[in-house]
């Protein structure tokens, strides 16, 4: 049977320092400051301000401008077309350009140019 007041005394072999040293007490720590809600609110406010600054910088910042430049270029690289390589190039004469314009296939600046090169129009994007 179990008695409520009876607790056996620990042996000296198990706890030999029981009577020699007093138990240490933890130093009193000041209570911690809440659940961190003010810090979380400050972090969220910083990110919101950063997002607003980014939106304003993109909206009012430098804009991209597009321009066109006519550059003299070689014909495009040879590509196989249904297994046939296009290797014979010739410049269109004024009569060829006139025929294509009547058929609705006229390409601007497709006539002969300086040094036998055909000019092409390339877009340039800059700040």
Swiss-Prot record:
Taxonomy of the source species: Eukaryota, Metazoa, Chordata, Craniata, Vertebrata
A Gene Ontology term for the protein's cellular component: membrane
Top-level division of the source organism's lineage: Eukaryota
Protein name in the entry: Small integral membrane protein 33
Keyword Glycoprotein: yes
Chain ranges passing through the membrane: 38-58
Main location: membrane
Keywords: Glycoprotein, Membrane, Transmembrane, Transmembrane helix
Residues carrying covalently attached carbohydrate according to the record: 15
Membrane-related topology note: Single-pass membrane protein
Record InterPro entries: SMIM33
Keyword Zinc attributed: no
Organism field: Mus musculus
Underlying gene: Smim33
Protein localization: Membrane
